[in-house]
């Protein structure tokens, strides 16, 4: 029984510091990532529908999404700079319990200002997992457990689990329609039940994190955990990633659903199906990204897979029918996320191990702050026009980001690419 539990990553008595302990940590993180991704997968799609059901307008939806990202950014910044003082397990369990409290709050509160406060303090994610206080902690742990040659593949698996499970979770966005039809309850009550389920997933994640061992792979970092050696490059990357994130904030899943809902009268069930296939394509692209990165390098993979996806994004609003818009959306999804594992691997590769938590936080937080402006602007644009101006602007900014990233990082290579 112990052997089976160790294989599955469920054995708490793995030898500290050994290979089995490292595998245990990674498996626990993958399991927890999957639980959170499943919840984020449907909540990111149902959030705008729920807020519209409560009587809020597109601008209100944008404001709440913006405040959610701002809150995530502040929390991630605090955690990133102080993570080296605590065991990661403690911080991850606390974050999971906060996730549970967030779901409970959205399930029982319907007034705008209290919801806004919960959005700022909590973990609700309008980007289906793209911005989260969990990520810097998990990235730092994974980068310590993996060798340089395996690091990109490890982050690809991490991203694969998140994206694949989020895609399956997106299918659950059709559950409120089913609950209304089968149970005869109102749409508001059905949506509130989905937020209760989100809270339950938060508790499940807390139990999974609690199983992490308090050993060298998750213990305190040295006191010099802030940026020193890599400060200049990390801040350059943070600025570039912020430009990309600002564009991404205009087209978060919640805002895309809002545009499709307004433009084509999209149902929640169909939205879930669309984003399931989009997530599925993105999931398998992570594995392909590893192969491409081994051939052409991390930076080239980030740039030359991202460019065509941004062009597809610009073209979506010009499509005359929902079918054509969905086709381009899926084509974009097949390419747009290849930079996720490669970007994370690149940042973790070019900084010293003791600076990784701070680097992960500093490159994540500006992304969160920058993307937070996007929903507010997108909501304002969509409140005056059903044309997809947010998509056009987002695609243009992302193309600019790709070109600037290529110019800035072309000579800074990770260890595995240095001959």
Write out the residue ranges for each language-model feature.
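Residue-level signature of mid-helix packing/kink "hotspots" within the transmembrane helices
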Residues: 69-77, 166-167, 279-287, 368-372
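Transmembrane alpha-helix termini and helix-breaking/packing motifs in multi-pass membrane transporters
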Residues: 48-53, 166-189, 258, 262, ...
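Helix-to-loop junctions at the C-terminal end of transmembrane segments
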Residues: 75-87, 177, 285-298, 382
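Structural signature of the two symmetry-related core transmembrane helices
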Residues: 90-105, 300-315, 395
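Helix-loop boundary and gating motifs at the non-cytosolic
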Residues: 19-70, 233-241, 245-276
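C-terminal membrane-cytosol helix-exit motif in multi-pass small-molecule transporters
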Residues: 173, 177, 199-218, 401-409
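Hydrophobic core of transmembrane alpha-helices in multi-pass small-molecule transporters
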Residues: 34, 102, 112-133, 324-338
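Conserved MFS/SLC helix-loop-helix module at the cytosolic interface between two early adjacent transmembrane helices
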Residues: 74-112
């Amino acid at each position: 029984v112990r052997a089976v539990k160790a294989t599955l990553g469920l054995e708490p008595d793995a030898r500290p510091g050994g290979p089995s302990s490292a595998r245990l940590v990674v498996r626990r993180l993958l399991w927890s990532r999957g639980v959170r991704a499943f919840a984020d997968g449907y909540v990111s799609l149902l959030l705008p529908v729920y807020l519209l059901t409560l009587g809020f307008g597109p601008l209100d939806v944008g404001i709440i999404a913006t405040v959610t990202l701002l809150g995530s950014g502040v929390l991630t910044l605090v955690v990133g700079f102080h993570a080296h003082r605590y065991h990661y397990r403690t911080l991850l369990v606390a974050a999971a319990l906060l996730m549970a409290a967030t779901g409970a709050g959205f399930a029982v509160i319907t007034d705008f200002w209290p919801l806004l406060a919960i959005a700022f303090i909590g973990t609700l994610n309008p980007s289906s997992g793209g911005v989260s206080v969990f990520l810097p902690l998990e990235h730092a742990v994974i980068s310590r457990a993996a060798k340089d040659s395996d690091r990109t593949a490890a982050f690809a698996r991490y991203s694969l689990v998140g994206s694949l499970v989020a895609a399956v979770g997106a299918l659950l966005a059709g559950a409120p329609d089913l609950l209304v039809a089968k149970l005869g309850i109102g749409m508001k009550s059905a949506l509130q039940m989905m937020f209760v389920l989100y809270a339950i997933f938060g508790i499940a994640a807390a139990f999974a994190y609690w199983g992490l061992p308090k050993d060298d792979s998750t213990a305190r970092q040295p006191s010099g955990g802030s940026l020193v050696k890599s400060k200049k490059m990390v801040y350059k990357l943070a600025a570039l990633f912020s430009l990309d994130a600002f564009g991404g904030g205009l087209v978060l899943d919640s805002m895309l659903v809002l545009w499709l809902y307004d433009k084509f009268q999209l149902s929640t069930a169909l939205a879930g199906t669309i984003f399931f296939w989009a997530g599925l394509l993105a999931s398998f692209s992570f594995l392909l990204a590893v192969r491409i990165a081994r051939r052409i390098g991390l930076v080239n993979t980030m740039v030359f897979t991202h460019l065509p996806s941004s062009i597809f994004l610009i073209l979506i609003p010009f499509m005359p029918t929902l079918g054509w818009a969905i086709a381009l959306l899926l084509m974009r999804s097949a390419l747009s996320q290849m930079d996720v594992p490669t970007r994370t691997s690149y940042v973790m590769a070019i900084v010293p191990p003791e600076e990784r938590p701070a680097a992960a936080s500093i490159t994540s937080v500006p992304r969160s702050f920058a993307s937070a402006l996007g929903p507010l602007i997108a909501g304002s644009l969509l409140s005056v026009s059903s044309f997809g101006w947010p998509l056009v602007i987002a695609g243009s900014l992302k193309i600019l980001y790709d070109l600037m990233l290529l110019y800035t990082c072309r000579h800074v290579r990770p260890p595995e690419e240095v001959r």
